[in-house]
Amino acid sequence: MSQTTTITPTVPVRELWEATAPVTGDYARDCAELAREALSHVGFTRFEETPFEDVLACREGDLPVTVAVLPVPVEGFEMTLADLESLIDEDVVAHGAALCVGRALASDGPLPERLRFDVVSVCVNLDAGRVRVHHVRGAWQS
């Protein structure tokens, strides 16, 4: 866990499916649940509870991944993946790295060899009956 690497972006993937997470009216919590559902849909597993409403802890294969969820207001429904990437500055990366390391230290098992921090934006447009999710993998990785 002592070496930080630069991540090469992956090719954007567009997938559509019917969301099943209920909408409760608590926008931040709803966005976190929709992010969890979207990540599950693309193979993320073993979700764990975190003390933060806007942070998910899960795994992609054996890799522990900590995910920040950015709830985007409906006015930002046209936000693109590039827009999300532009919001990930040094402060976000440092915060993500700290979340990853804190999660690793709080776990009961041995420290993992690798950690990763991702960022997911979620925008719910109830009028259109649509949700837009963007996922930046590897905003930080050790």
Which residues does each PLM region occupy?
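Acidic-basic catalytic patches of nuclease active cores, encompassing PD-(D/E)XK
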Residues: 2-50
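Short acidic/glycine-enriched loop/turn segments that link adjacent beta-strands
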Residues: 52-54
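Active-site beta-strand-loop-beta-strand hairpin of nuclease catalytic cores
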Residues: 58-76
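Catalytic cores of nucleic-acid endonucleases
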Residues: 70-126
